[in-house]
Amino acid sequence: MTISNTAKITPELVASHGLKPDEYERILKLIGREPSLTELGIFSAMWNEHCSYKSSRIHLKGLPTKAPWVLQGPGENAGVIDIGDNQAVVFKMESHNHPSFIEPYQGATTGVGGILRDVFTMGARPIACLNALSFGAPEHPKTRRLVSGVVAGVGGYGNSFGVPTVGGQVRFHTRYDGNILVNAMAVGLADADKIFLAAASGVGMPIVYLGSKTGRDGMGGATMASAEFDADSEEKRPTVQVGDPFAEKLLLEACLEIMANDCVIAIQDMGAAGLTCSAVEMGAKGDLGVDLDLDKVPTRETGMTAYEMMLSESQERMLMVLKPEKEALAEQIFKKWGLDFAIVGYTTPTKRFVVKHGGEVKADLPIKELGDEAPLYDRPHVPSPKLPVIHAREINAPLSVPDALEKLIGTPELCSRRWVWEQYDHVILGNTVQRPGGDAAVVRIEDGPKGLALTVDVTPRYCEADPVEGGKQAVAEAYRNVTAVGGKLLAITDNLNFGNPERPEIMGQLVGCLKGISEACIALDSPIVSGNVSLYNETNGRGILPTPSIGGVGLLDDFTKSATLAFKAADEAILLIGDTHGWLGQSVYLRDVCGREEGAPPPVDLAAEKRNGDVVRGMIHAGTATAVHDISDGGLLIALAEMAIAGGIGATLDPAPDSTVPHAWWFGEDQARYVVTVKQDDLLGVMTKLKTVGVPCTQIGITGGATLSIAGERAIEVTALETAHEAWLPAYMAAKN
């Protein structure tokens, strides 16, 4: 067929749309003619990394995604797990990295808004948000502004929308100087028998546009998110979307109401690539065609072209396939909430994606090839070289153990994140049981007794040093954090942030991390049910640390029995659970005290993780554990200091065993470990049981007093540790560049 073309399709125009020459040749063969500008834009949106996962799909297929409690795995807007009593948890994590670097406030707000829509599109009411934020070195001139804007954006949207932000991560490293990471996670609650999906069904069904009007904001956002940055990237502000949390709140209530009234056949939020991606995905998943009439699309700007409307990423919009007999009711509901409602098309049996505007056909394309049959690459990849193991006795301690503790507790890596999370409303809705600052957030489900344990974890320096072990450790850390509050990890969502996949060494990092993640998910019985891939996180050829963020969701049968990390009382025994070898490779101590960022990261024994976690969870459920904290960044002594600070109670600690190197004993980052306190009356019984089941356990001290003191070393006031722990971030943010 003939479609009028107002723009000459040149190699430069093709390249500016993020399409490689061979991909353009594939388009020519597929449609048998030169595409129109609108069609080129549609292919650009659907075939970029952000929407098609063309570089990662072949490897993602190897991830474990099934379990008896998984109701919906990857491929929909979000994952869904069954938690009993006809209740389901709907959750996903997604990145908004590139927009947040260009315009930090709006980039972060729309990242939160987008992930919330993914959750309530499935029929769930959002109950919590988390995030993982990675910034450049503190001394970099842009870092302070980016931190300020992103944190304000995350808080501004979540607080206004009315969902608590209950946990997350914040890190600083020079490798994020040119590419910050903003990974947002949302969790919702739905009826297990009322989950809504994106696949259209039925021919001639009306396709309805819902929500806010379409403007020119966000043009080409998905394509920008699939490319490297260069020196001019900050000029791309027009491609950053603008969010309105109050409009999204109205959209949430309207969507849940039409769902409750059985109006919906299929529903899809308009996220990346806007109207294009939502319409194509609904049709392709249902083996149907879609006809759109753009003259019916509500717009807030005059003179918008078909190209602009199809690629706009204006926020707070949905596309729905409606039951025809419910049209009047659905329209009434949306008008009640003050939102646009317009029938913009119909499903067809043709498997074609047809777009009309001004009485002319602007696009006529095969819908399956746009969607789930987009290009698939098996890119060359090479494994990361193994780094040498650093033996503890090879590392001389430049500081005494107390001096090292005082230094580390206030570093950017280990200091308190209170300045960040106090800007988030973490108690709105009234269901937050454990606030930020612990191992995992705990949110009760309605009136209980069940609760959810929620966490986000990854250690990027481990992933770069050994992608396989780093991938395993990210999942194991999520498992430990959920366990430490008394939860059982049920499933995870991942957000895979990497550099340029066209470089074999970067592709090797992705493949290695996925291998480790897969092994850990299988061993810890926690399938992946949703996720996101963000590639090309590079600026001028310099990539980020590989950062596969893991969002974990666990279940507590009784939220009132959850554990916290704070010391509860004096004269309680302090137990170290798990093997300690003093692993210093890639540790915070080695980097920030010794000035060496090197060596192999700690190996992850998944069998030990499972065994130790089961025992600790059992202690929490039995009521014998009075405080629990997993040991991670900074090692054993940092964990103990955090417990002392949280409880306002000191501890007297035994010296490191004679067979160990003291600084490695206290600051090594061996995995599968916890600190647990128990009452003296329970000590013998606990130690006997742990020995019986083969779990390493050592009493290392006793709680009490106002200082943290190691036999033979200088004691440190807990209040001094708290001051050092809390000081750095507020002081940094208050300073001037």
UniProtKB/Swiss-Prot annotation:
The protein's name in its UniProt record: Phosphoribosylformylglycinamidine synthase subunit PurL
Annotated source species: Rhodopseudomonas palustris (strain BisA53)
Cell compartment(s), UniProt: Cytoplasm
CDD domains linked to this entry: PurL_repeat1 (cd02203), PurL_repeat2 (cd02204)
Entries under Pfam families matching the protein: AIRS (PF00586), AIRS_C (PF02769), FGAR-AT_linker (PF18072)
Binding residues for ATP: Y53, K92, D494, G531
Gene designation per UniProt: purL
GO BP: 'de novo' IMP biosynthetic process
InterPro entries the record matches: PRibForGlyAmidine_synth_PurL, PurL_linker, PurM-like_C_dom, PurM-like_C_sf, PurM-like_N, PurM-like_N_sf
Similarity comment: Belongs to the FGAMS family.
Sites where the protein binds Mg(2+) 2: D118, D269
Record pathway: Purine metabolism; IMP biosynthesis via de novo pathway; 5-amino-1-(5-phospho-D-ribosyl)imidazole from N(2)-formyl-N(1)-(5-phospho-D-ribosyl)glycinamide: step 1/2
Residues that, per the record, bind substrate: S95, H96, N97, H98, R117, Q241, E313, S314, Q315, S534
Quaternary assembly: Monomer. Part of the FGAM synthase complex composed of 1 PurL, 1 PurQ and 2 PurS subunits.
Catalysed reactions listed for this entry: N(2)-formyl-N(1)-(5-phospho-beta-D-ribosyl)glycinamide + L-glutamine + ATP + H2O = 2-formamido-N(1)-(5-O-phospho-beta-D-ribosyl)acetamidine + L-glutamate + ADP + phosphate + H(+)
Catalytic activity, EC: 6.3.5.3
Keywords assigned: ATP-binding, Cytoplasm, Ligase, Magnesium, Metal-binding, Nucleotide-binding, Purine biosynthesis
Positions annotated to bind Mg(2+) 1: E94, N532
Coiled coil regions in record: none
Active site: H50, H96
Gene Ontology CC, one term: cytoplasm
Primary role: Part of the phosphoribosylformylglycinamidine synthase complex involved in the purines biosynthetic pathway. Catalyzes the ATP-dependent conversion of formylglycinamide ribonucleotide (FGAR) and glutamine to yield formylglycinamidine ribonucleotide (FGAM) and glutamate. The FGAM synthase complex is composed of three subunits. PurQ produces an ammonia molecule by converting glutamine to glutamate. PurL transfers the ammonia molecule to FGAR to form FGAM in an ATP-dependent manner.
